[in-house]
Amino acid sequence: MDHKSPLVSWNLFGFDIVFNLSSILMILVTAFLVFLLAIICTRNLKKRPTGKQNFVEWIFDFVRGIIEGNMAWKKGGQFHFLAVTLILYIFIANMLGLPFSIVTKDHTLWWKSPTADATVTLTLSTTIILLTHFYGIKMRGTKQYLKGYVQPFWPLAIINVFEEFTSTLTLGLRLYGNIFAGEILLTLLAGLFFNEPAWGWIISIPGLIVWQAFSIFVGTIQAYIFIMLSMVYMSHKVADEH
């Protein structure tokens, strides 16, 4: 079944800018859940960590390992909180659309994973790529940063510039494609469960269980891949040579 998106447009200087209200809602829900998780897990910190504090420290150590695998900690340490926030945000965003969806009578979809929207994932990837340029210039200086585009010889500049666009697209669309495809199949299986007779239940229930588990795995892996590639791109820009 096709679902509609709750769209609103805003005219700015003669141009219509369209907003997807469900995506905005889910972005805010995800941000709130990340904030809530951080508050809950960091209350009453102790020198000897237990329970929730162990979980938080494991996340920080795991992300530190990703950063150190791509650049020296002396340079990469400043991106630690950024990477931790990103991996938590993307993981939670990937999970939100799995247990259920909220659809109104007119087939308007309100509850979904925000990462099932290409606009959201491409905005995330664009932000990351822009940050790599910002820190590349800040840490290496404009001259050294620009020299990286013409090394080892200047004709590569065209390829290097083109690579920036392809990196942005692949980083965002990979995340979107995997999450969107997973939710589409879950919707089809759920439709089979609710709309077909008993034989539909026999097929859909095992399928839903298996695909839910697989979608959790895919959502986790995609969060990891996004952070890994983000740190790879960052290391290419802040390294003395790339």
UniProtKB/Swiss-Prot annotation:
Gene Ontology biological-process entries: proton motive force-driven plasma membrane ATP synthesis
Keywords attached to this entry: ATP synthesis, Cell membrane, CF(0), Hydrogen ion transport, Ion transport, Membrane, Transmembrane, Transmembrane helix, Transport
NCBIfam families for the chain: ATP_synt_6_or_A (TIGR01131), PRK05815.1-4 (NF004479)
Lineage: superkingdom: Bacteria
UniProt xrefs under PANTHER family: ATP SYNTHASE SUBUNIT A, CHLOROPLASTIC
Protein name as catalogued: ATP synthase subunit a
Origin species: Staphylococcus aureus (strain N315)
Protein task: Key component of the proton channel; it plays a direct role in the translocation of protons across the membrane.
Assembly and interaction partners: F-type ATPases have 2 components, CF(1) - the catalytic core - and CF(0) - the membrane proton channel. CF(1) has five subunits: alpha(3), beta(3), gamma(1), delta(1), epsilon(1). CF(0) has three main subunits: a(1), b(2) and c(9-12). The alpha and beta chains form an alternating ring which encloses part of the gamma chain. CF(1) is attached to CF(0) by a central stalk formed by the gamma and epsilon chains, while a peripheral stalk is formed by the delta and b chains.
Stretches assigned to coiled coil: none
Protein family per UniProt: Belongs to the ATPase A chain family.
